[in-house]
Amino acid sequence: VIEQPSGPPRTQSDRSPVPDRPLLVVTVTYSPGAHLDRFLKTLAHATERRLLVVMADNGSTDGAPEAAVERYADVELFRTGGNLGYGTAVNRAVAAYLDTPDSVVDQEFFVVVNPDVQWGPNSIDELFAGAARWPAAGSVGPLIRDPDGSVYPSARHQPSLVRGGMHAVVGPFWKSNPWTAAYRQDRLEPSERAVGWLSGSCLLVRAKAFRQIGGFDENYFMYMEDVDLGDRLARAGWQNVYVPAAEILHDKGHSTGRDPARNLAAHHRSTYTFLADRHPHWWQAPLRWTIKSALRARERAVVGNSRRKRRRAN
């Protein structure tokens, strides 16, 4: 758990200007359980700005989003109407709360974040400070820690057909392979820099840039939507900026881990969709076929191994 500040609040001279309108914070919920309460509790220490938290709910059945509305001020439940996927749910919430004539939220930036995040002290303020240092930043992301305290490689290169494909296929079996190391920038110490893409688990997004590229690509139901977003922002002339002075903890997979086989298949579909979309030429077809076949083989191997483990456990 990230420690929260116990000392006195920052003085006025330490504070960045606070806009009159609240900052929109969009989190996509799907039966988030106790994670949501921890998310909202730690959010109080992330910034001195006024906030409006919108839960874009994809069909929760655990009552957690409704309980959060009752317990916390400035938290609203926005029902998407079904399990639309991560990027589509964000798009719907942004359209409803930011892109309307009567919008009451800040029009320059908004936050996209998973509900299983715990915020570090002043983390949102640090993201804003980073955005101020990088005027061309279309997205800004923090340092992300896993529950064991290790740093998650959330700032990465864009995946080329070979580098990204080999990472997806051999990464789970050969952890130290050179393609994964290059893709994840494993050998770089955390430093503020522009990168290929940032984890969508927590992003400060410039609204102008988001509108320019049409938001998240809704062809991605789950996985790779953040890779695609970062790539399209860069192609449109924006930067994806990693700001490790901002820090969060991410308890990954609270909902996606419920059906590993299904989620692996979804990840492979999204991986292939991205790589095929970026490499559409006829002369690249053999590589596309190879990657697709390798992903299918990996899926069969991983799912089969998982089923064998379950049978032995029973």
Where are the regions that the model predicts?
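Conserved donor NDP-sugar-binding/catalytic core segment of glycosyltransferases
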Residues: Q118-P153
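A short, conserved alpha-helix in the catalytic core of glycosyltransferases
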Residues: R187-E247
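Active-site-adjacent helix/loop segment of glycosyltransferases
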Residues: D228-R310
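Short, acidic, metal-binding catalytic loop of nucleotide-sugar glycosyltransferases
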Residues: K41-R50
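A conserved acidic beta->alpha catalytic loop
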Residues: R49, D57-P65, G82
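Short aromatic/hydrophobic "clamp" motif used to bind/position activated sugar donors
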Residues: F110
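Glycine-rich, basic loop-to-helix element that forms the pyrophosphate-binding segment
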Residues: T80-V105
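Short, flexible, basic/aromatic active-site loop/helix in glycosyltransferases
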Residues: P159-V195
